[in-house]
């Protein structure tokens, strides 16, 4: 049994931000995550057994990109650009309406990572010494003087995850009464032998029953590889959460139709995100229980849902808990 000041459950961006902020304030921090690697929905993987020349290449299958508005987050992003971790990607995406490309939409600069968005979280976590992956906390027990989760005891606990996941560890009365709802997404990766589609970075696909978004991962990564990632419509995805691969025929057909691709992909893969994103965000930066030493952070807070909101929320919660500890 280990003992620590702060147990951070969830090693996505908000969890890492919380841990870093608390550690910088002098707290002893332990981070645990059920996944094989840190990053959460900032998820990347290496392609394997595709039958193409692109095995070993990284693809993002979680968050597609991120933006930066807060001055502190902007400063961190600029530093990561200088270090080669992050690259400005684009400020313009195409729009597909009523069966045809209808123009482009320009907005804030979207940032990507040559090594995959997971490397952003890994970079920010470099100063954390106590990170434990493949650790599933089934129950967070309230004990005199703190909490216990699995083999870890702590004075405080930060749950950096979607609230429905936190509800599996704690009774409902120990969590905030919010009306936030989450929608699922199935991310479909398509690897082609050659790139034959229109030069673009991504496409917002409106009013389509199958897909809502297509990212050109070659443009995102900067190597121009013929790799696409399509996000399945949440309503369609909800019917296939137990069998994500079941969306592949329709998702492949829809992607080829939108981008006018004649050839079939050489390799495809579907990944389920049951809690992909909150439909709206809470303006509060985080939540602290009024009586118990626990709190919540993530991209449903700090005005989310955005990647930046996850970082802002986690940092704010980590600082608040460190202040309570000292």
PLM regions and their residue ranges:
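Glycine-rich FAD pyrophosphate-binding loop
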Residues: 7, 23-54
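Short hydrophobic core segments
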Residues: 7-9, 32, 152-166, 314
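N-terminal FAD cofactor-binding segment of flavoenzymes
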Residues: 21, 43-93
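A conserved short coil-to-beta-strand element within the FAD-binding core of flavoproteins
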Residues: 133-147
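Flavin (FAD/FMN) cofactor-binding core of flavoprotein oxidoreductases
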Residues: 249, 254-292, 302
């Amino acid at each position: 049994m280990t003992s620590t000041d702060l147990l951070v459950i969830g090693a996505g961006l908000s969890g890492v931000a919380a841990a870093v902020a608390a550690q910088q304030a002098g707290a002893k921090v332990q981070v645990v995550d059920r996944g094989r690697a840190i990053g959460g929905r900032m998820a990347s993987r290496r392609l394997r057994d595709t039958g193409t020349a692109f095995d070993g290449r990284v693809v993002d299958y979680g968050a597609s990109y991120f933006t930066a508005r807060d001055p502190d987050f902007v400063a961190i992003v600029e530093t990561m650009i200088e270090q080669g971790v992050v690259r400005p990607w684009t400020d313009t995406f195409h729009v597909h309406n009523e069966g045809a490309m209808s123009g482009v939409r320009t907005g804030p600069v979207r940032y990507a990572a040559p090594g995959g968005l997971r490397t952003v979280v890994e970079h920010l976590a470099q100063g954390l010494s106590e990170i434990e992956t493949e650790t599933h906390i089934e129950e967070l027990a309230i004990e005199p003087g703190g909490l216990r989760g699995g083999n870890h005891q702590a004075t405080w606990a930060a749950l950096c995850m979607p609230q429905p996941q936190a509800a599996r560890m704690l009774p409902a009365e120990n969590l905030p009464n919010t009306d936030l709802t989450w929608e699922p997404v199935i991310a479909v990766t398509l690897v082609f032998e050659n790139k034959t589609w229109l030069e673009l970075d991504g496409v917002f696909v409106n009013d389509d029953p199958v897909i809502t978004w297509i990212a050109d991962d070659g443009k995102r990564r900067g190597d121009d590889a013929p790799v696409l990632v399509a996000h399945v419509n949440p309503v369609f995805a909800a019917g296939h959460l137990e069998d994500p691969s079941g969306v592949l025929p329709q998702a492949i057909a829809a992607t080829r139709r939108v981008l006018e691709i004649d050839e079939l992909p050489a390799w495809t893969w579907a990944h389920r995100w049951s809690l992909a994103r909150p439909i709206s965000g809470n303006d509060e930066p985080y939540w602290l229980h009024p009586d118990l030493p626990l709190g919540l952070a993530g991209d449903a807070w700090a005005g989310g849902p955005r990647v930046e909101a996850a970082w802002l929320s986690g940092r704010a919660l980590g600082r608040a808990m460190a202040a309570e500890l000292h």
